[in-house]
Swiss-Prot record:
Active site feature: H132
Family membership: Belongs to the ketol-acid reductoisomerase family.
Gene Ontology BP term (one): isoleucine biosynthetic process
NCBIfam families, per the entry: ilvC (TIGR00465), PRK05225.1 (NF003557)
Positions contributing to Mg(2+) 1 binding: D217, E221
Source organism per UniProt: Vibrio cholerae serotype O1 (strain ATCC 39315 / El Tor Inaba N16961)
Keywords: Amino-acid biosynthesis, Branched-chain amino acid biosynthesis, Magnesium, Metal-binding, NADP, Oxidoreductase, Repeat
Protein name per its UniProtKB record: Ketol-acid reductoisomerase (NADP(+))
Enzyme class per UniProt: oxidoreductase
Catalysed reaction equations from the record: (2R)-2,3-dihydroxy-3-methylbutanoate + NADP(+) = (2S)-2-acetolactate + NADPH + H(+); (2R,3R)-2,3-dihydroxy-3-methylpentanoate + NADP(+) = (S)-2-ethyl-2-hydroxy-3-oxobutanoate + NADPH + H(+)
Length: 494
């Protein structure tokens, strides 16, 4: 199979990368009705599989799980996930032939074998669904021409898909129809109904393409969403402990600080996050973030270039063929980091203290969001896609760190995201250790500025505020957040 994106000419590539339209709520007036009375069979019952299925069932759909016979016989975790939640479970041969919509929610590296196994069993005119287009775009999977191929891609880990649904909301979702596979012209109706059944329409859906979803998703998860949180946690913890900060306090400031800081980001963008700081702290965070952007821009651009060219995909697939040797090795190394093993503490940290004592963390968030957004848009991905894959999804990933540190983040994201995260962090950590962290102290990470006066130069503050507020990610963010008035606030801090 050939990389689908690389078979397109430049005009077609740019057209597919630029597909992204925010859909009006009126387009979801019938919600999930198009799929009611039809049989939905999900293949795979991991984080995305289980949680999407729970939402879809609660939305009135007929949902079953098809698993490999070995998973059923051995009662593996996927079988337990489905059975313990009251779902009908069967083998491919039992469930696939009667399914109207087969949704493949297995890990990326299993997609080719899974699709090759289920496609001969699918009835004429059925639909095949994905939540990530890697198999279509990067592996070039060819689907039988009578089958409609759609995508519904929630912009967060599977656990958060469920949590946001239970809060009465949802998560922003990209939907798409593969242009090579829409024989009956019903792809968009299927995708809209599926998205509504997960609750995505409440947060906002983007009519996109498989190509735009894959390229933007890979970039976001590798850099700001996961890679920067991992690198930042590791180097900031090391710095604080080396400079005499109590290890328990240092670890807690980071583990729960990312969530607290990015919760402000979710509701008011970088502007609001920076406004939570005093004026002197805001200027300091701005200066640090500008330095970080200069230092890390080449790394962000390299990741974007490798994603667009297909180099990242081929590298990761080579590791698949090597039994994930690199992935498992990097996972084990992460488990041994000092941050992952910090001693728990009962110390209370107030919400504002996370901002006051986490100035460097705020600088890292601003720098990372803007760098990822800039790299994506410079490559032809439009602002809406770049916003969701850089800024909006960040609080959802930070929530996972708050639960069980980096372990939880890497468990709930896909193996593809985890692999890309390590590629980024493995370069970012030594880069920051050598070029940046020796120049900072506990005034920006651990203790705060400790200044008595908030007096600053007016001209400097005006210039800083103007630069922050006039970045393109802030313009598109304000527009898109206007569609998400129902976002639920989560409890942060102690």
């Amino acid at each position: 199979m050939a990389n689908y994106f690389n078979t397109l000419n430049l005009r077609e590539q740019l057209d597919q990368l630029g597909r992204c339209r925010f859909m009006a709520r009126e387009e979801f007036a019938t919600e999930a009705d198009y799929l009611k009375g039809k049989k939905v069979v999900i293949v795979g019952c991991g984080a995305q599989g289980l949680n999407q299925g729970l939402n879809m069932r609660d939305s009135g759909l007929d949902v079953s799980y098809a698993l490999r016979q070995a998973a059923i016989d051995e009662q593996r975790q996927s079988f337990k996930n489905a059975k313990n939640n009251g779902f009908n479970v069967g083998s491919y041969e039992q469930l696939i032939p009667t399914a109207d919509l087969v949704i493949n929610l297995t890990p990326d590296k299993q997609h080719t074998s899974v699709v090759n196994a289920v496609m001969p069993l699918m009835k004429q005119g059925a639909a095949l669904g994905y939540s990530h287009g890697f198999n279509i775009v990067e592996e070039g999977m060819q689907i039988r021409k009578d089958i409609t191929v759609v995508m519904v891609a929630p912009k967060c880990p599977g656990t958060e898909v469920r949590e946001e649904y239970k809060r009465g909301f949802g998560v922003p979702t990209l939907i798409a129809v593969h242009p090579e596979n829409d024989p009956q012209g019903e792809g968009w109706e299927i995708a809209k109904a599926w998205a509504a059944a997960t609750g995505g329409h409440r947060a906002g859906c983007l009519a996109s393409s498989f190509v735009a979803e894959v390229k933007s998703d890979l970039m976001g998860e590798q850099t700001i969403l996961c890679g920067m949180l991992q690198a930042g946690s590791i180097v900031c913890y090391e710095k604080m402990v080396a400079d005499g900060i109590d290890p328990g306090y240092a670890g807690k400031l980071l583990q729960f600080g990312w969530e607290t800081i990015t919760e402000a980001l979710k509701f008011g963008g970088i502007t609001h996050m920076m406004d939570r700081l005093s004026n002197p702290a805001k200027i300091k965070a701005f200066e640090l973030s500008e330095e970080l952007k200069d230092l890390m821009r080449p790394l962000y651009n390299k990741h974007m270039d490798d994603i667009i060219s297909g180099h990242f995909s081929s590298t990761m697939m080579a590791d698949w063929a090597n039994d994930d040797k690199d992935l498992f090795g990097w996972r084990a190394e992460t488990a041994e980091t000092a941050f992952e093993n910090y001693p728990t503490t009962d110390v209370k940290i107030a919400e504002q203290e996370y901002f006051d004592n986490g100035i460097l963390m705020i600088a890292m968030v601003r720098a990372g969001v803007e760098l990822a957004f800039e790299a994506m848009t410079a490559s032809g991905i439009i602002d809406e896609s770049a916003y969701y894959e850089s800024l909006h999804e960040l609080p959802l990933i930070a929530n996972t760190v708050a639960r069980k540190r980096l372990y939880e983040m890497n468990v709930v994201i896909s193996d593809t995201a985890e692999y890309g995260n390590y590629l980024f962090a493995n370069v970012a950590v030594p880069l920051l250790r050598e070029k940046f962290m020796p120049k900072v102290g506990t005034d920006v990470i651990g203790k705060g500025l400790g200044v008595v006066s908030n007096q600053v130069d007016n001209a400097t503050l005006i210039e800083v505020n103007s630069i922050i507020r006039n970045h393109p990610v802030e313009y598109i963010g304000e527009e898109l957040r206007g569609y998400m008035k129902d976002m639920k606030r989560i409890a942060v801090g102690d």
